[in-house]
């Protein structure tokens, strides 16, 4: 925390001096917590839910009212809607099944089995019989059965479960029995039920829409078909409704998603719940994709099907698959990968990978950490001096109760060389999924590598880490280790860099896996010719 009164007093005496000197009060983050190793984290919506919301707003702008249709549909409704075609349609429906409730009695044999477990049944026989009878009649839910048995016999729930497993094996042998109820395979089956209830209650004409999940028993799922999908469906009911309303709604709805020209082509399927010659496929042109796409189907419900539901006015229905529209909008090729990305390979961006390249060793003590910057500045300033040569950086620290004098010597003994090698200022970039070391200038770089490195520098993402930065942190970290181990001197020599570890860098496992799986590279090779001797007294 700032000492505010002292700062104000200093500023009153000499504002310029106070302004400069208080700079040191703003501490910089440590290297592994600084940008770009920290990055903003954003929430992410699902493309299907985005499309659903966009469709909702599009329908509402067109004056439609939102409804939720029944999801569970009796097979009788399918027969009413499809007539003779129903049997073929039901083949694609999922039927709901449930486990029967066995008639479990409390015979002398079962009482004996319970008592063999060390439980006295005689006092609780009537309560136990009542629970078993209640389960059979459906007044007791299955997930409460173990709890109620345990209460009745005044035992733990663990023992109650043991009784259910060992004394009443009938429960383990149950086989699900199908009902006559189906999961909605298309929104139309729900619309007929809704329209039947609204007939005579809601003034005509009315416009309704519903966006919800449907279930279809496909033979197999592939890149364009799932067993569960979302339908964005609407109906218009009124005395003057006909096929032209479908065309107008299709244009009004789809134009809000970037489609322009429209073609209306008679559908060859001819579903029996539509009036003959009204079932129509909608093809729309998308300027960005530059192609015609089938995006919706509409038709006017058959008077035969409507009459069976007590509806005596024409009804136009239009429907489209939400996932289909999402794939078009997001340029996805496989509906499975779009809907369930968690089951497919995830790709990290160059920016994400750049945040995962970190320093391996960094000093813990602030005083030694701060020494690193001095060492970096000294090396960069003198990197090109002619050898034989050496640089010295000397500093005194208090470690515990002991005074430590540290002398860092960077040297090159060989004649007519430079203090440090040509790659010492190379910077780590991430480009097209690769991690590469890019030189400060491209002078002397082979032509076969030059174009790639130039593109990497312009289009890639920098980590902000130079070889000299990471190596200097390695040196000061070893100084700190020497303090702890009471070592008086050590040497460090890094002639040629071949890997990230050579320059005191590491990469998170998730990024490394992607680089390897996608046949990308980590190429940080380069001569640095760093020679260091450290003496501690």
UniProtKB/Swiss-Prot annotation:
Q: Which residues bind substrate?
A: 186-188, 231-233, 273-274, 317
Signal peptide limits: none
Specify the enzyme's EC class, one word: ligase
Q: What is its EC number?
A: 6.1.1.27
Q: Which reaction does it catalyse?
A: tRNA(Cys) + O-phospho-L-serine + ATP = O-phospho-L-seryl-tRNA(Cys) + AMP + diphosphate
- UniProt KW keywords: Aminoacyl-tRNA synthetase, ATP-binding, Ligase, Nucleotide-binding, Protein biosynthesis
The record's listing under InterPro entries reads:
aa-tRNA-synth_II, aa-tRNA-synth_II/BPL/LPL, O-Pseryl-tRNA(Cys)_ligase, Phenylalanyl-tRNA_Synthase, SepRS_C
Q: Which GO terms describe its biological process?
A: translation; tRNA aminoacylation
**A molecular function GO annotation:** phosphoserine-tRNA(Cys) ligase activity
Give the PROSITE patterns listed for this entry: AA_TRNA_LIGASE_II
What's a Pfam family this protein contains?
Answer: tRNA-synt_2d
Note the superkingdom of the native organism: Archaea
Could you describe the subunit structure of this protein?
Answer: Homotetramer. Interacts with SepCysS.
Q: What does the protein in this record do?
A: Catalyzes the attachment of O-phosphoserine (Sep) to tRNA(Cys).
What family is reported? Belongs to the class-II aminoacyl-tRNA synthetase family. O-phosphoseryl-tRNA(Cys) synthetase subfamily.
What is the protein name given in its UniProt record?
A: O-phosphoserine--tRNA(Cys) ligase
């Amino acid at each position: 925390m700032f000492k505010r009164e002292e700062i104000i007093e200093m500023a009153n005496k000499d504002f310029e001096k106070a302004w400069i000197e208080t700079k040191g009060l703003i501490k910089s983050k440590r290297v592994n917590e600084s940008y770009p190793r920290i990055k903003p984290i954003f929430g992410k919506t699902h493309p299907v839910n985005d499309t659903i919301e966009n469709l909702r707003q599009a329908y509402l702008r067109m004056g439609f009212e939102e409804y939720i249709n029944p999801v569970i549909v009796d097979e009788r409704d399918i027969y009413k809607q499809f007539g003779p075609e129903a049997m073929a349609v039901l083949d694609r429906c999922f039927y709901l099944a449930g486990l029967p409730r066995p008639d479990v009695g409390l015979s002398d044999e079962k009482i004996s089995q319970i008592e063999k477990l060390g439980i006295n049944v005689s006092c609780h026989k009537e309560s136990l019989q009542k629970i078993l009878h209640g389960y059979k009649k459906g007044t007791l839910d299955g997930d409460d059965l173990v709890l109620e048995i345990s209460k009745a016999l005044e035992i733990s729930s663990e023992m109650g479960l043991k009784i259910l497993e060992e004394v009443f094996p009938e429960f383990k042998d149950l086989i699900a029995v199908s009902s006559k109820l189906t999961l909605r395979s298309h929104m139309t089956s729900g619309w007929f039920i809704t329209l039947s209830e609204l007939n005579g209650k809601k003034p005509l004409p009315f416009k309704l829409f519903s966006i919800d999940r449907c279930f279809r028993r496909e033979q197999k799922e592939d890149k364009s078909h799932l067993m569960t999908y979302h339908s964005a469906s609407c109906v218009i009911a009124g005395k003057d409704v006909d096929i032209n309303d479908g065309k107008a709604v299709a244009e009004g709805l789809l134009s809000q998603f970037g489609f322009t020209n429209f073609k209306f082509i008679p559908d060859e399927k001819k579903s029996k719940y539509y009036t003959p010659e009204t079932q129509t496929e909608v093809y729309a042109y998308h300027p960005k994709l530059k192609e015609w796409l089938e995006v919706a189907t509409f038709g006017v419900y058959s008077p035969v099907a409507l009459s069976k539901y007590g509806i005596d006015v024409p009804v136009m229905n239009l429907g489209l698959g939400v996932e289909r529209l999402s794939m078009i909008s997001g340029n996805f090729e496989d509906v499975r990968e779009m809907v369930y990305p968690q089951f497919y390979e995830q790709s990290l961006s160059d920016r994400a990978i750049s945040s995962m390249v970190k320093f391996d060793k960094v000093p813990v003590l602030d005083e030694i950490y701060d020494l690193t910057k001095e060492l970096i500045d000294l090396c960069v300033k003198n990197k090109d001096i002619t050898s034989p040569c050496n640089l010295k950086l000397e500093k005194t620290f208090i470690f515990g109760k002991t005074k430590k004098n540290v002398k860092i010597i960077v040297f090159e003994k060989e004649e007519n060389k430079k203090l440090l090698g040509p790659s010492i200022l190379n910077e780590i970039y991430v480009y097209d999924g690769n991690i590469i070391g890019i030189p400060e200038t491209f002078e002397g770089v082979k032509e076969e590598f030059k174009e790639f490195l130039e593109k990497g520098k312009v289009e890639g993402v920098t980590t902000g880490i130079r070889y000299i930065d990471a190596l200097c942190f390695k040196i000061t970290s070893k100084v700190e280790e020497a303090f702890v181990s009471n070592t008086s001197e050590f040497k460090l020599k890094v002639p040629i860099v071949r890997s990230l570890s050579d320059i005191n860098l590491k990469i998170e496992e998730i990024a490394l896996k992607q680089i390897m799986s996608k046949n990308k590279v980590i190429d940080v090779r380069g001569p640095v010719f760093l020679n260091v001797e450290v003496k501690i007294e």
